[in-house]
């Protein structure tokens, strides 16, 4: 028993203290309320609980310590058991995959031996084979083998379903398709699974298998609801449902997929889906198109859609010992690539792109749901994961609707101004208008937007990885965005404009990025962008005090397999309610070169993007990308009143064209060897970024005797860009030297962008008598002596704000031939007044 003196004596002799069941029960209750009580709290517990009064406070402390240790051990044991179950399941999966690969090798060896023995039959095989595997797609000619229509009566559909099931299983676990590992996939316990793409089969196909922490029934339920996880799925309508004798289900389905770009039509499918349970308890969901049937239901062609084909595909879901499921996925499509321009055909001929956008998307979504169930924590801004997931789906769907502009959703095309680079659409349907709220003006009048205008365009990019370009657009919004347009868009959901802003390239105050949530593998994340308003708006515009954008970003990981990259954003009200209106705009960049999709560039874009010059160093890893291409799609939406349609259309067209020009300029700066590829040489006065960083650092050390940059490997470029003091270069002209370069701190101090930097002269920032006198007296000293130091003072940003600095240093930057190249200034410990 636990008496006070006996407890102390036993504790001193290292013996255990025995507690009565009542005491243990009381301590457990206290532990649940407070696992780690302080000394005062423990004494209070003894007073409040008489049953513990005969136990020493020190011994109660030991009990709580031991209880926390046991809890930690229990959790660790539980975690290790879960890991062990996962590893056991993965080992089983790998053994099955190894067996399948051995069968595939045996099959290939047999085929190779056969063709070696019968070389004369190869020509006949090539000319007489009329199976689906011999479909030829070349140029604008699409040759489809002629087959007799299949019977679509209930008995005929059951026959098709059984045939589809057999073909799907042979693809998922057999050798019906030659699978090769998808480039760039990293195996391991934390990987998404085993992902493979087809080699040498009809159409495009992808296969994946992995572990999911959900039971098979729940997995099947989620996978059948494609619009919830497949962002490209516009709709999935179940037209008819039939039951089979073995307890299975036949479904006739009409499905529509969005087009990823404005340059190609969308796809639709008329298909059969068969769900059944196999003898070993596995769930199977398989599907295929019903494009050539008779004696049953059919789906006529839809305008603005190209009827594509799903070849036998589906999901094999097996229960896993200890919980969860082992999942096999096969996606096999013929997306009719003949129907799109030649330059875009690889979008519809890339199995890798299919794997990224469809097959892996299913696995990622299931893993995300599993984690949310096991860890239902509240994330940023008080949102639960399901609510944030719904917001991301609304952003994606709204952007896809804008890109596609279907007439059945109320979109109609406006007349062009003679230049077809930007397409304008307007939507005044009641459904669309429910997304906006009333617009109160400064004079007290309240208006309701009666339409939404969309300005969209697509353009081809060359030699710039999508992840690099999109990350730049996200981190340097000031390079392309106009605050007045953002403010106008924000007004549509809170306080409306009475007159239109004038787009001004480079008109941008600043931004603060507030992280919101991210997926398990960080391939997609959401954030809130807080924009600093410039305050240069008309008096009759009731602008929000703060401008917030909800933003979703994906595909910016440079080390991942190059895939589709998206930056989609929409203005939101500060209240950020779940039913807030969302009118998304944004960018989508898709690589067009399947051969280069597996490359993983590792680029530094900071300083390099500041210079309008050509190639990187010879050792740049991106040089191996060659003539890589991608297509960028841009879509911006604005709510407005119908009587302002002409003015809003003109403003939107002008703004999108300015965004396109800015993106092209940035893409050129980020492109490796862009000038060499076009047959041009950079002018001698424009060194590359790495060279300029080396010249600046070397000249500083020569004239001032100390190092400007602390040793940071060999990457002077990155060190200079992230230097805490404002570093900026200007031309050698004695009269009105023009800025040619600034690091990040320098751009922040000048309140400008890389695009507008060259419009700022040195004398503009010293826009006061003392500053100009100092500049006129010190500038010649730099040219003669090589450097100069200035005491603290005040200068001006490009926006007219006063900036104070503790000290300034100027020095002459010499090139490799010891000739002056530019003048560099560094402002130490600067701040806005």
Swiss-Prot record:
Annotated InterPro entries: HD, HD-Zip_III, Homeodomain-like_sf, MEKHLA, START-like_dom_sf, START_lipid-bd_dom
SUPFAM superfamilies named among the record's database cross-references: Bet v1-like, Homeodomain-like
PANTHER family, A to Z: HOMEOBOX-LEUCINE ZIPPER PROTEIN ATHB-14 (PTHR45950), HOMEOBOX-LEUCINE ZIPPER PROTEIN ATHB-8 (PTHR45950:SF6)
Induction comment from the UniProt entry of this chain: By auxin. Repressed by miR165.
Coiled-coil blocks: 70-108
Gene3D superfamilies (UniProt xref): 3.30.530.20, Homeodomain-like
GO biological process: cell differentiation; meristem initiation; positive regulation of cell differentiation; positive regulation of cell population proliferation; primary shoot apical meristem specification; procambium histogenesis; response to auxin; xylem development
Subcellular location: Nucleus
Record's function text: Probable transcription factor involved in the regulation of vascular development. May promote differentiation of precambial and cambial cells.
A GO term from the CC aspect: nucleus
Regions recorded as binding DNA: 12-75
UniProt name for this protein: Homeobox-leucine zipper protein ATHB-8
Domain START: from-to ranges: 150-378
Family classification: Belongs to the HD-ZIP homeobox family. Class III subfamily.
Source taxonomy: Eukaryota, Viridiplantae, Streptophyta, Embryophyta, Tracheophyta
Organism this protein belongs to: Arabidopsis thaliana (Mouse-ear cress)
Oligomeric form and interacting partners: Interacts with ESR1 and ESR2. Interacts with ZPR3.
Superkingdom field: Eukaryota
Classification via Pfam families: Homeodomain, MEKHLA, START
Name of the gene encoding the protein in the UniProt record: ATHB-8
GO molecular function: DNA-binding transcription factor activity; lipid binding; transcription cis-regulatory region binding
């Amino acid at each position: 028993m636990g008496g006070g003196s006996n407890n102390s004596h036993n504790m001193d002799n290292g013996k255990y203290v025995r507690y009565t069941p009542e005491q243990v029960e009381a301590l457990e209750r206290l532990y649940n309320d407070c696992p780690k009580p302080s000394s005062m709290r423990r004494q209070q517990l003894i007073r409040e609980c008489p049953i513990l009064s005969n136990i020493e406070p020190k011994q109660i402390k030991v009990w709580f310590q031991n209880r926390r240790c046991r809890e930690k051990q229990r959790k660790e044991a539980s975690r290790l058991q879960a890991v062990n179950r996962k590893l056991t399941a993965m080992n089983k999966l790998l053994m099955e995959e190894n067996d399948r690969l051995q069968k595939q090798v045996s099959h290939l060896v047999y085929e190779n031996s056969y063709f070696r023995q019968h070389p004369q039959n190869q020509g006949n095989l090539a000319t007489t084979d009329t199976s689906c595997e011999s479909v030829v797609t070349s140029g604008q000619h699409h040759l489809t083998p002629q087959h007799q229509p299949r019977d679509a009566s209930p008995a005929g559909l059951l026959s098709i379903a059984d045939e589809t099931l057999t073909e799907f299983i042979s693809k998922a676990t057999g050798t019906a398709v030659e699978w090769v590992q998808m480039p760039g996939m990293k195996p391991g316990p934390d990987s998404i699974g085993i992902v493979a793409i087809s080699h040498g089969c009809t159409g495009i196909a992808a296969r994946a298998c992995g572990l999911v922490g959900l039971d098979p029934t729940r997995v099947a339920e989620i996978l059948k609801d494609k619009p919830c996880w497949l962002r490209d799925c516009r709709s999935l309508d179940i037209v008819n449902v039939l039951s089979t004798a073995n307890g299975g289900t036949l479904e006739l389905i009409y499905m529509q997929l969005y087009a990823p770009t404005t340059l190609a039509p969308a796809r639709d499918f008329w298909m059969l889906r068969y769900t059944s349970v196999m003898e070993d308890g596995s769930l199977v969901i398989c599907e295929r198109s019903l494009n050539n049937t008779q004696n049953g239901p059919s789906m006529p062609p839809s305008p603005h859609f190209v009827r594509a084909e799903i070849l036998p595909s589906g999901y094999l879901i097996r229960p896993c010992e200890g919980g969860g499921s082992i999942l096999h996925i096969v996606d096999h499509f013929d997306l009719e690539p003949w129907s799109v321009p030649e330059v875009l055909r690889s979008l519809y001929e890339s199995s890798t792109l299919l794997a990224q956008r469809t097959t892996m998307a299913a696995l990622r979504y299931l893993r995300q749901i599993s984690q949310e169930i096991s860890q239902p924590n509240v994330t940023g801004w008080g949102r639960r994961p399901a609510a944030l997931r719904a917001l991301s789906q609304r952003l994606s769907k709204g952007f896809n609707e804008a890109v596609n502009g279907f007439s059945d959703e109320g979109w109609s095309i406006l007349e062009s101004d003679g230049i077809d680079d930007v397409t304008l659409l307007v939507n005044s349907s009641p459904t669309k208008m429910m997304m906006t709220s009333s617009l109160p003006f400064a004079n007290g009048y309240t208006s309701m937007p009666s339409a939404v205008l969309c300005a969209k365009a697509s353009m081809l990019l060359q030699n710039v990885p999508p992840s690099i370009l999109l990350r730049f657009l996200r981190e340097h919004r000031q390079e392309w965005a106009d605050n007045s347009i953002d403010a106008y868009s924000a007004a549509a959901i809170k306080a409306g404009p009475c007159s239109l802003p004038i787009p001004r390239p480079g008109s941008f105050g600043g931004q603060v990025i507030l992280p919101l949530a991210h997926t398990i593998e960080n391939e997609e994340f959401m954030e809130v962008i807080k924009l600093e308003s410039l305050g240069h708006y008309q008096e009759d515009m009731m602008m929000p005090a703060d401008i917030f954008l909800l933003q979703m970003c994906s595909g910016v990981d440079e080390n991942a397999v190059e895939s589709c990259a998206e930056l989609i954003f929409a203005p939101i009200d500060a209240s950020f309610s779940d039913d807030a209106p969302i009118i998304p705009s944004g960018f989508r960049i898709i690589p067009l070169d399947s051969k280069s999709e597996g490359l993983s560039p590792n680029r530094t874009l900071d300083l390099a993007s500041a210079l309008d010059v050509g190639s990187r160093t010879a050792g740049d890893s991106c040089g191996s990308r060659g003539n890589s291409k991608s297509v960028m799609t841009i879509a911006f939406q604005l709510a407005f009143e119908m009587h302002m349609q002409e003015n809003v259309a003109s403003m939107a067209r002008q703004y999108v064209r300015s965004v396109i020009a800015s993106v092209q300029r940035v893409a050129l700066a980020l492109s490796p060897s862009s000038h060499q590829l076009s047959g041009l040489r950079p002018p001698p006065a424009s060194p590359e970024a790495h060279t300029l960083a080396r010249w600046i650092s070397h000249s500083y050390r020569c004239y001032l005797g100390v190092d400007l940059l602390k040793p940071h490997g060999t990457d002077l470029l990155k060190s200079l860009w992230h230097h805490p003091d404002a570093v900026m270069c200007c031309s050698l002209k004695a009269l009105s030297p023009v800025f040619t370069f600034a690091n990040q701190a320098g751009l922040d101090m000048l309140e400008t962008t890389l695009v507008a930097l060259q419009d700022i002269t040195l004398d503009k920032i010293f826009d006061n008598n003392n500053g100009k006198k100092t500049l006129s007296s010190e500038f010649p000293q730099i040219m003669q002596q090589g450097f100069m130091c200035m005491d603290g003072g005040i200068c001006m940003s490009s926006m007219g704000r006063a900036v104070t600095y503790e000290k300034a240093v100027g020095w002459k930057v010499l090139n490799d031939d010891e000739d002056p190249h530019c003048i560099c200034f560094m402002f130490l410990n600067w701040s806005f007044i």
